[in-house]
A protein has these predicted regions:
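Glycine-rich "substrate-gating" loop/helix at the edge of Rossmann-like oxidoreductase active sites
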Residues: 53-57, 83-88
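Short flexible/disordered coil segments
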Residues: 69, 99-100
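Conserved catalytic cysteine-centered active-site region
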Residues: 73-81
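N-terminal beta1-alpha1-beta2 module of alpha/beta enzyme domains
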Residues: 1-72
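Glycine-rich anion/phosphate-binding loops
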Residues: 18-26, 86-99
Length: 100
């Protein structure tokens, strides 16, 4: 059985520490140290009012965030919980995913 950890972008009040360089590094390293197998980010390029009201202010670009976490860790697998395809050019999305 494998366990993954999802970036807590909508788990409560907005916390800017979770989206900065230091916060992402600490989060990824903590997930790896705790034994998680993967870290995930959800794609919400255009959040609606319901999403924002639930605290979804920290929706990072998943591929940029995953690349950052990959550079900070040594064994975590990377995943997107959602990649909203209609918002993205399919060729650029494929290249970003392949690069990460």
């Amino acid at each position: 059985m494998r366990f993954s950890f999802t970036h807590p972008m909508s788990a409560g009040d907005h916390d800017p520490r979770l989206v900065g360089r230091e916060g992402l590094t600490r989060l990824a390293l903590a997930a790896e140290a705790a034994g998680f197998d993967a870290i995930g980010f959800t794609d919400h390029p255009m959040p609606g009012s319901r999403w924002l009201a639930a605290g979804g202010h920290d929706a990072l670009d998943p591929f940029s965030a995953l690349a950052f976490c990959a550079a900070a860790t040594s064994r975590l697998r990377l995943m997107t919980n959602i990649a909203v395809l209609p918002y993205r050019n399919p060729f650029i999305l494929a290249k970003a995913a392949a690069t990460v």
